[in-house]
Amino acid sequence: MNYLILISFALLVITGVESARDAYIAKPHNCVYECFDAFSSYCNGVCTKNGAKSGYCQILGTYGNGCWCIALPDNVPIRIPGKCHR
């Protein structure tokens, strides 16, 4: 049993674990990148520049009109619940 756990852990370390998430990309102070045109390429540019596969402007979303990114890397900050401190 211990060998199975050790081998599983070694495989995780060797292959690396990468994950991505779909979320609002955040500026410093937990603020979203605001957008006003759902058909603009602004959000796609912001998202792909930060390593996401794509992005779009989500109109009237949870945090207002903000950029929503698809497959955003874990090292990029996302909007979390709480206030935007500008």
UniProtKB/Swiss-Prot annotation:
Has the structural arrangement of an alpha-helix connected to antiparallel beta-sheets by disulfide bonds (CS-alpha/beta). It comes from Mesobuthus eupeus (Lesser Asian scorpion). GO terms for cellular component: extracellular region. Keywords: Antimicrobial, Disulfide bond, Ion channel impairing toxin, Neurotoxin, Secreted, Signal, Toxin, Voltage-gated sodium channel impairing toxin. Residues 21-85 form the LCN-type CS-alpha/beta domain. Expressed by the venom gland. Residues 1-19 form the signal peptide. Gene3D superfamilies: Knottin, scorpion toxin-like (3.30.30.10). Belongs to the long (4 C-C) scorpion toxin superfamily. Sodium channel inhibitor family. Alpha subfamily. Residues 86 form a propeptide. It comes from the Eukaryota. SMART domains: Knot1 (SM00505). GO terms for molecular function: sodium channel inhibitor activity; toxin activity. This is Sodium channel neurotoxin MeuNaTxalpha-5. GO terms for biological process: defense response. Disulfide bonds join C31-C84, C35-C57, C43-C67, C47-C69. Negative results: shows no effect on Nav1.2/SCN2A and Nav1.8/SCN10A. Shows a weak inhibition of inactivation on Nav1.3/SCN3A, Nav1.4/SCN4A, Nav1.5/SCN5A, and Nav1.7/SCN9A. It is found in: Secreted. Alpha toxins bind voltage-independently at site-3 of sodium channels (Nav) and inhibit the inactivation of the activated channels, thereby blocking neuronal transmission. This toxin inhibits inactivation of Nav1.6/SCN8A (EC(50)=790 nM) and drosophila DmNav1 (EC(50)=280 nM). The toxin (1 uM) does not significantly shift the midpoint of activation at the two channels, but induces a significant depolarizing shift in the V(1/2) of inactivation of the channels. Has antimicrobial activity.
